[in-house]
């Protein structure tokens, strides 16, 4: 009887604790999602989420001396004639998704390098691109795309330029999409998965790599501006123990003082504010000593910025990685489902980036220079 009573007490305690946990998790009224979270490893846990990256970057000077449309008074700018740039409202299949990724705006900044700087481009929403109605525009179609009812084809007012194009869909692509995209062959794809997917449905396609590998055009910093800052993008120690062990073996780096950055942003930010935030991140990455990232959007730009970067992932993504995975220093699970370390280290124990990306970035620059 005594053992039964003890068991009942344990059950009651578990139920009470479960109820308390549910109440804590559901009480989210006072939780604020910052445009991006930046905090230092030495900060206490209670203060980490109170350090706002936007507030910190407002103090940062524009060292490049270049000013873009989103850094000027919008009312004083004229629209660029015939140029569009992609924005992102994360609207899929009739509903707005909860996720956000400032990396999308980094992709748009890469495209913006090939447009005039003294005017503002027309905004075209990636996820409802077939419903764009405005002046005729040229639009670089780089980055991540999921084909659905809102973007099976481009609006008649858009002249799409398909380079660094990635398709998220696993299923067979609709015929209406295939018939439309064939008008603009050959299609430059960001990865081999997208290239092969298009070719298997009769579309001429080639691997062009990612457009963010051209970001040195506007965002490359001088070497004497480089800091000792180590940045973790959407990664922290404890997320992937095998990778942690490798990072701690890099004795040339001090991992006791790390800047953590989250690529999610507050969806309430205007598109101009999102561009501002993306540029400030690039300015920061261009001056870092080392970047550890679980985001392709945070890794590939570093190749162009000449900032040493290690891409970490727990699981090989067969849709996104083929082709671009080989351009990076990587620590994680490879295509054979085995843990692998592929990182370039010099005689001083410092990380340096592979240079294979250059053969593709040079072609992209030449292709888009006279857009």
What does each model-found stretch correspond to?
Residues 1-17:
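N-terminal Sec-pathway targeting helices
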